[in-house]
């Protein structure tokens, strides 16, 4: 899934002679805190409401403001992971997309990113989620997949989180099997720590509920 497939057709663009008041009005209407600024088809940067509030005068044209450009966009062939990385690192509600000739192609809304994460992580597919913990030096994706497949299941998605101030990693797996008991038993035999599990049809435990709450807070930024 690449950036060009995530483009929204509702994100307005700003011109340098638009006023801060006009820009804030568009942001309020579309419930975003950033909008791209163009000079013709040339991308000039990404304007935020914080920049305008700090400037003070909402009647001035946005061309008078210092609008950041670096690390505020992705290219149209960028993978969704790169889009997420830019949005997360800069806390963006909108991610502009350019082609390799630096021509503006459109923008991606944060809500569009989140709506596509379920496809990336196979959230809608039936199965179980297993959260493992293991030493970094012992982590092997091949071994993890082998354990799952030994129990006649398949890994649908996998992501790894390096735990801060620790020599361990957390591995979150989505497998295509609801009855994950045998898989858990095998992981335990291989000395993996089972931190969490979730199976379709079961209620989320407290930790999973907290993580879901954090995701919702991120959506509302």
Predicted feature locations:
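A conserved regulatory-domain signal marking ACT and ACT-like small-molecule sensing domains
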Residues: 126-221
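Intrinsically disordered, low-complexity terminal regulatory regions
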Residues: 13, 18-28, 34, 206-214, ...
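Short acidic/polar active-site loop segments enriched in Thr and Asp
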Residues: 33, 93, 154
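Short beta-strand/turn micro-motifs at beta-sheet edges
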Residues: 116-121
């Amino acid at each position: 899934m690449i950036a060009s497939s995530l483009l929204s057709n509702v994100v307005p663009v700003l011109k340098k002679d638009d006023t801060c008041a006009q820009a804030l009005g568009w942001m309020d209407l579309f419930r975003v805190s950033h909008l791209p600024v163009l000079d013709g088809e040339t991308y000039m940067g990404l304007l935020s409401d914080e920049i305008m509030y700090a400037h003070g005068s909402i009647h001035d044209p946005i061309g008078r403001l210092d609008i950041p450009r670096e690390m505020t966009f992705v290219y149209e062939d960028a993978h969704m992971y790169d889009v997420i990385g830019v949005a997360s690192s800069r806390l963006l509600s909108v991610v502009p997309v350019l082609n390799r000739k630096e021509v503006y192609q459109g923008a991606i809304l944060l809500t569009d990113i989140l709506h596509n994460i379920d496809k990336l992580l196979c959230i809608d597919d039936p199965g179980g989620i297993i959260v493992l913990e293991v030493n970094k030096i012992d982590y092997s994706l091949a071994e993890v997949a082998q354990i799952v497949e030994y129990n006649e299941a398949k890994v649908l998605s996998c992501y790894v989180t390096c735990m801060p101030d620790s020599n361990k990693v957390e591995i979150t797996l989505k497998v295509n099997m609801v009855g994950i008991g045998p898989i858990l038993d095998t992981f335990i035999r291989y000395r993996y720590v089972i931190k969490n599990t979730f199976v379709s049809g079961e209620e989320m435990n407290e930790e999973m509920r907290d993580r879901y709450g954090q995701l919702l807070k991120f959506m509302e930024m």
